[in-house]
From Swiss-Prot:
Residues noted as binding substrate in the record, renumbered to the chain: 91-94, 113, 237, 309-311, 538
UniProt name for this protein: Phosphoribosylformylglycinamidine synthase subunit PurL
Binding site for ATP: 49, 88, 498, 535
Alphabetical list of NCBIfam families matching this protein: FGAM_synth_II, PRK01213.1
Lineage: Bacteria, Pseudomonadati, Myxococcota, Myxococcia, Myxococcales
Xref: CDD domains: PurL_repeat1, PurL_repeat2
Amino acid sequence: MTEPITPEIVAQHGLKPEEYQRILEHLGRTPTLTELGVFSVMWSEHCSYKSSRVHLKTFPTSGPRVLQGPGENAGVVDLGDGLAAAFKMESHNHPSYIEPYQGAATGVGGILRDVFTMGARPIASLNALRFGDPSHPRTAYLLEGVVAGIGGYGNCMGVPTVGGEVAFHPSYNGNCLVNAFTLGILPADKIFRGTAAGVGNPVMYVGAKTGRDGIHGATMASAEFDASTEEKRPTVQVGDPFMEKLLLEACLELFQTDAVVGIQDMGAAGLTSSSVEMAGRGGNGLDLFLDQVPLREEGMTPYEILLSESQERMLLVAAEGKEELVRSICEKWDLDVAVIGRVTASGRWRAHWRGAVVADLPVDPLTEGAPKYHRPMAPHPALPALHAFDAAALPEPADLGAALLRLLARPTIASKEWVYRQYDHMVRLVGAVRPGGDAAVVRLAVSHDAHAHKGIALSVGVNGRFCFLDPYLGAMHAVAECARNIACVGGEPIAITDCLNFGNPEKPEIMWQFAECVRGIGDACRAFGTPVVSGNVSLYNETEGQGILPTPTVGMVGLVEPVERTCHSTFRDAGDVIALVGSLQGEVGGSEYLSAEHGKEAGRPPALDLAREKAVQETVRRAVRAGLLSSAHDCSEGGLAVALAESCMMHEVPADGSKPAWIGCAVRIPFPVRKDFVLFGEDASRILVSLPKENAARFVDLAQQCGAPVIRLGAVGGDRLEIQGALSVPVEDLARAWRDGIPAVLRRDAAHAGTTAPA
């Protein structure tokens, strides 16, 4: 007997009444409960991008290196010499807040599958994490669980986590962010896509068995949190990295045959989304026979089978007649494998169960015909007052050295060593620059002379405070800083992926933030020649009406060639000259300093001149490639003083303890405005460099050729950070504050906790 579809059931499926009316119009009848479940997940924000798609279409997505842009499992760019890179970034925010270890672990698993589905072997991962106020009772619990989940899954897969960023802000108290990025390498002429082509071709299920975990995960990821958050724990998937490792190796072996026509990861919305999307891309229909799906639990219904988000599963369209070849390879790797359907010419998506059709839907309304909203937009009403804020009226700290120590201890600025020590960043020995620097650099793990000198630079980042105060400018800063980080290691930016994390799009101010950030990313990408080739949107990041800062995370990929000629972030040799490429403006709007010292999050983000930015980057990139520099470090959170301090102490400690993990410096800074503003302001387009004295004249000439200003500041040496007329602090004290920032958060939690998982 068919269950009646009531307004309550429609609402439980996350559908608006007007959306249900559209379903009735598409079908000309009442849907079954199973069909309603299919529409629910396919029309969720997570799968349909119904609020964001109209804005995303404005991104630049093509370029001379782009082999695959948005719309597939991952973007692909040409690295030259027959080699390509596939990469993407995705969010797993809502699951990670509910169940931090499994939420983060399965986020890593999902992004790895997106990349190797394209035919690529993953070689490097990064992540961008956001947590609440360090003093919030849940922050330490989430931090420990998320980091353990990322490390646990990635380490078992043998894919190094080579970098990333972690930041803390009260807006994330009820909604942490876990954005995972993976890059893989593949032959440029062997890209696999998620398409159901070839009428009559078999549809095959490969991987782990299907259980009840994760049902309606996509719908949950498209809703705000409330007091019932803990009840959503069953919608979080459970990952098995060892199964995923088998799946990875089996897929890569299958790609060496002629058996694979199309392949798609079963991620959000599971078998439903993967099969519908493949049918949509192929312009065909699909018949699924759910009796053939390998099941882990007894008594599962068609509804549960279709909407399960059990992990480590792939849907594959094989060439007709190649079923046994696929089966033999999958069984060799101890994977479940079954023919569960056929490609049809009907243009319809049908699910069969025990001889009956339990779902019969047209493909188009589930894909391109899904709702597309032009939601109302309006600037945030608080912005005029925030922009009018005058920082000049604030008192200047009596002790600038003490202010620097406090900034260095802020978890957003402090050393992330506690985090990356839990990740295996040395597996496969691909790292050319260790974690903790501006950008990760990985060698291409391929045995070919033409590739031996190629490396890839990777950077992720965004400043959510900037994006709140000025979404357009803040998003441009995100792209510019990633490009600047890549320039610091001698890389040439190629392309970006993004992960756009926002609050409730039904609020006009949130939709305005989103649209402005998209516009900012697009304009900056056009300026840098870095098309957007993949990405993800995560909306409804709110808890009981409180939204996060707009957080459009950017992940950028650059080419480093030759990879032997790169650069580190830390001062190297006593006597080296220290210089600033860029200028001194003392812009503190939206800065970490303003928040830390004065409790203010106001003003405007620093101005950004893209022509100046490109000149600064080109100067440093060319200097690195010419071997002129000992170090190069981007000035960002905390400003010039923090950049100087980090350059003094971001050293690996020698195993024999023969020298300390720091070196001092003495500089003289011209102060055009207040000293604290110049020291801690986060002016754009600045890179701190050090270089041997004999290279100084050549470097200044190079900067003039590129049109970038250079200010000579001082020299490396000693055991103190000395800024003439401002501060003098032992580097050992700076290092102690900097290294203890995150461990202090965990100690505070342990001291007053006594419970494993605070409510």
